[in-house]
Amino acid sequence: MHHTKLFDHGILINRGSTDRSVEICKLFAPHWEIRDSKVLEFDAVLVDQEVMNIEKEITGWKMVLNTTEFLCCADKHAFFSSLATLGQNMYAIRTILMVDDPTHGYTNPRYGIPLVKQRYHGRLIHPNPPAPYYGGRLIHNFFHGSYWAGRHWSPHPFMIYMYPAFVLKFFYSPWNTAMKNRKLQIGPTLSKHSIRHGLGIHHLATLDKLEKNYIHFTTSTTDLRLNSEYQVLFPDLCFPNH
């Protein structure tokens, strides 16, 4: 698994997913923990509280990612050393929203090749100072992240990590039946509390709405191989003849 090479330990919180996450974890990361969620409905506040309670058990650098999110850096040791050198306890790692270019001719992924090597179209969420940056995922060594709902923001002081490292969020990619079904399975599990407070309501979508969303996001997707920072992370994709 992608993250076994980056982190010493991993905990998969199983929320009854039907995307084979548990089976895949047992196969490729048998030393990782699998914990069944105690939150029966998808409630953004309660889910994040559960995550933070687990974080309290862990020391060192911690990062909470969804199964569709992949932390990517060029060199693991240089990355974690830089977190210490920069002197902060929390960093926002910039996110790239992966969105298939419908004209590119992508085929279904092959399981023997890392997904991050099979897709290279997306949109980088750029920080826009002085506006707060809500587009990243947080890595920290606090007792817990004190996250706001959604885990993109925290009252803890943090800085945006402006070096070649990204979270690749497979947003509308791979845009195939499996991904569509995955998106559709979340909405029915939303709690009334979340819906009432407008938390996670983007998951309340029909297939037609998803297709329209996808078309909308394709207008801003780009070939990441032309991005200089992405080239540092994936030189084999960007310069295949070198």
Predicted regions and their residues:
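Short beta-strand/loop segment that forms part of the nucleotide-sugar
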Residues: 8-16, 37
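Ser/Thr-glycine-rich phosphate-binding loops at phosphate-binding pockets of nucleotides
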Residues: 2, 15-21
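Receiver (REC) domain switch/active-site residues of two-component response regulators
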Residues: 8, 30, 68
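A structural signal for isolated positions on well-ordered beta-strands in alpha/beta enzyme cores
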Residues: 9-11, 33, 166
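Hydrophobic residues within beta-strands of alpha/beta enzymes
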Residues: 10-11, 62, 91
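Active-site-proximal specificity loops/subdomain of glycosyltransferases
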Residues: 20-65, 73
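Catalytic-site signature of metal-activated, phosphate-bearing donor transferases
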Residues: 44-52, 72-242
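Short, well-formed alpha-helical segments that are part of the catalytic scaffolds
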Residues: 1-8
